[in-house]
Amino acid sequence: MPGLSVSTVFFKFSSFHVSAQDDDAVAATAAAEANLVKIGILQFAPHASLDNCYEGIIEGLKNTGFIDGISATIEFVNGMGEIETNNLAAASFVSKNYDMIIAIATPSAVAAYAAARDAQIPVVFSAVSDPVSAGLVRSLDFPDTGATGTTDTLNFDGQLKMIRVFLPEAKTIGVLYTTSEANSISQIESLTEAAKDYDFEIKTVGITDASEVAMGAAQLIAEKIDVMNNVTDNNVVNNFSVVTNATDPAGIPIFGSEIEQVARYGCVASESLDYVALGILTGEMAGEILKGEDVMTMPVRVVKDSFPVYNSEIMSKFELQLPADYASATDVAGAR
């Protein structure tokens, strides 16, 4: 046989051998991926505190042995503050038969639970202020619905004390909130009750969507408020520059509900929750459930610890001095 023919036969055999190896590798990879735990993570909107939750969740999952591409397949969707986008993402996770959905913020948690309930896919939520009122669990101690997670309980006593010390002459606190966010309504009820002990009057304006934020802020200013206090309202936080564009020229300072609102968004100070830590706890709970713990009986875990932060640059805009009571608080000016 001529040399050319021998080379050709050898080449064809080698190509067949390599092709078979490639097919085997693809099949092995597909089989391995099929055996990975599939987790969908749904975040309501792109703002800093929820981003911190997501960061913590990934760390918490890792702490319990679930790492994307190694022991789990994790798909992340940001709902961009749109209810319909959140609903579609949750339905997509269910249609793909995911093993779990982790939802960040109340609207995402409600969407995930509505989609996953009949499919009996466990839902673990993070940063949901009142999961009972939102219809996610029967009680904090015994969820009994197929959903559990973490709740961010704001330290209103600490927050009101801070406002009173920073602004001893203040009498009225304004709050802007979204009427469809159950967490905001619950927080305002708690804030209003706590305000009685600090001689504050709470004035609120409810809005329905982002297009009404500017109008709502203007209405609060017209109410002659002395200061604003921001809760964890996703719609308001996601459009916070619209609020400060109205309040800053009016000389009305805003106190935030967590560190990012002080470091990034223009709030003066806050008794802040640590949303990375909240996310870590959420991720670890999710990992425990994936390893066999019962989502029906795992209690909702409440995070209450807060720490004081302030922004010296924002304080200067309002000619405020740091009170002696907060000398040990953390200045987050320029920290982000």
Predicted regions and their residues:
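Short hydrophobic alpha-helices and adjacent helix-cap/hinge residues
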Residues: 1-336
